Amino acid sequence: MTIGLKNRLNNWRDSEVTPPHIPEVCPKIDVPSEWAQQALAFEPSPKQKQILDDPGHRLILNCARQWGKTTVIAVKALHEALHNPKINIMVLSRTKQQAALTIHKVREFAALLDIKRRRYQSREHSVELPNGSAIFAIAHNAATAVGNTVHIAVVDEAAVVEDDVFAAILPSIARTKGKLWLLSTPSGPTGMFYKIWHDESLGNWTRITATVDDVAYADKEVLQLETRLFPNRADQDFYCKFVQPAGRLVDPALLERVVNHNIEPIDLDRYRKKP
């Protein structure tokens, strides 16, 4: 990041409206990773570049803790919003505070570009851009997910989002033929995130894994300590494995593999004595 961009961000106080947009500061570049480099001075890693430039409608990211998934998705969302007028991007997470982090990142990047912006429909965690596109966060419940029509649905910490909330999100992108981006660290071999990650029959998904080995700044001493003290947790948080929770006697994935869904049910009425 250049000194000028740093100073611009340091002087920003998250005002409701920033100075007028300066066109040359925000060039229209169709390739997101190139735009991030030129407009934001954001240098993506090879894995982040893959995420930014993926054009698919279905994207699922299996990421280590502190890998930077929120930041890279904020960059990707802002690029989509700036380059596609009048689209809505909805962000949901297990807590509204977590979803708000993505919005905060978006606002930070918009401030770097001196983009005029305001809240969308007076929502607390939102940003509306001059071209009419909006990015907003919603709470983790089916009631608030229903009724939104969006072009991109972003689900952060998707491994801990409840199934009924997932079910409520899908209609929001049906009319627009919208995109669905899921990002999370695993949380056991259960739930929609686990199912979508493993079931290739669920459509054309781009699946990207980013372990701690893709994090250049990871503290090796901390990794070794957690690996020795909490090996299962280290496998999950750092190496993106769907680990069985400690203390559980039966592995649901194992049960699923041994169940034969082709067996027809027994007609018990045949064996009942007639009066």
Predicted regions and their residues:
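Residue-level preference for the first positions of well-ordered beta-strands
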Residues: 58-60, 88-90, 152, 179
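Inter-Walker segment of RecA-like/P-loop motor cores
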Residues: 100-151
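Pre-P-loop entry segment of helicase/translocase ATPase cores
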Residues: 1-58, 268, 273
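ATPase catalytic-site recognition across NTP-hydrolyzing enzymes
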Residues: 212-275
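ASCE P-loop NTPase helicase motor core
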Residues: 108-110, 152, 160-233
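Walker A/P-loop
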Residues: 56-76
